[in-house]
Amino acid sequence: MKTTVEKLSPTRTKLTISVTPEELQPSIKHAYEHIAGQVNIPGFRKGKVPPAIIDQRVGKEAVLEHAVNEGLDGFYRLAVEENEVRPLGRPEADISEWPNEKDFSGDLLLTIEVDVRPEITLPAFDGITLTVEAAQVTPDDVEEELDRLRSRFCTLVTVDRPAKKGDFAQIDLVAEIGGEEVDTAANISYEIGSGELIEGIDEALDTLTAGETTTFEAPLMGGDHEGENAQITVTLNAVKERELPEADDDFAQISSEFDTIGELRESLRGQVERAKSFGQGTAARDQLVEKLLELVEIPVPAQLVEDEVSRHLEQESRLEDDEHRAEVTESSEKTFRTQILLDEIAQRENVKVSQDELTQYLVQGAAQYNMDPNEFVKILGENGQISSMVGEIARNKALAIVLGKAEVVDTNGKQVDLTEFVALPDDGEAVDEDATPEDTDAPAEEAPAAEKPKKKAAAKKKAADK
């Protein structure tokens, strides 16, 4: 099999693949076997119909088309592997020349275009300086954390005043579309300002008093009319506010393992300090990505971005929202650029993903969705998403390696210890040889690199071939 590779653009490649009759023969044999098992011909059992009879009843043209369709994916995969092409998205195949359908002589000529990962030049990582906020813990920070803990032990008390943010409203809801009632809910307890119910509900309830009713328009969040605008009538039955317990020794003993409120405050101070240190690490990672994206030119296939944007908007039922489309386009392009950048770093730094790392990552993912880990892994496997998880781990490790080479200081000029956020280059083998960034050239939402080509309309056979 001969393949020529033509670079159409930094992100688009054309493969011209020439397949000899000998190389196509296994697919032709399989085509005869498959057709023999499908057709009903008197005098022959299924699967036992001779090729000559299939030629008479079905036709060699059908056999050839079946063989080409069956072999196309394999020819493409082999060409990609032999020529070290790194695809992104779904390839498009055109059959330029067919073998002679009378005796299957002559080469099969395939032309396949595919978006590819661009070649990028990585900068030196030494000398990068990042500045993050100082992790200073104030008394107000500690009291804020204490109040959050107290709110978990609060009681709700009915009050006679207008509702405001932070109150719990006891409400009834009625949704109408075109004057017809489509949904109702009674006696719901909702925290005003949480944004967890329906768009516009916080503004509608603000300053409302018990017994009052108001109407507003908003898209429904679920049900048969999800996404449709409806007239929402909300009736406020009661307003309740949190009553926090006293911050004393009794509260410390009830809410923690400590005997005194002083000990509890000291423990909360440590929690706040750890949270701020974690925030420094997160901020440093984000800054590092932004700085690297500024330093490296990374073109992204336009179709790849457009496909992702369309999927996103379709899920949100906002295909006609041009303003939101622009926002999603910018976000998607940045996401792809970041993934390409980190994959390149992972490859240069020889990042490997061990089975233990993958297992830990999957267990954490299952916990986020409150799922059994085995069931979570099963679903990911059925949807071909395991390799995407491997890629995500590799990217995180790649970023941690670069972060370890950067100088991180706070706004006071003090060196920041980010030991928990950095990593050293791998020098061992991954447990799973396939668990490398190359398995995930495409992000989770993309078509995998070895996806079967999408065949265009085939060129008509010449009259001399028939």
Curated annotation (Swiss-Prot):
Tell me the Gene3D superfamilies matching this sequence. 3.10.50.40, Trigger factor ribosome-binding domain (3.30.70.1050), Trigger factor, C-terminal domain (1.10.3120.10)
Reactions catalysed: [protein]-peptidylproline (omega=180) = [protein]-peptidylproline (omega=0)
User: Which residues lie in Acidic residues bias regions?
Assistant: 426-444
EC number assigned by the record? 5.2.1.8
Q: Please give the positions of the paired cysteines in each disulfide bond.
A: none
UniProt keyword terms in alphabetical order: Cell cycle, Cell division, Chaperone, Cytoplasm, Isomerase, Rotamase
Please state every residue range assigned to the domain named PPIase FKBP-type: 166-245
Protein's name in the database: Trigger factor
Source organism: Leifsonia xyli subsp. xyli (strain CTCB07)
Per the record, the gene is tig
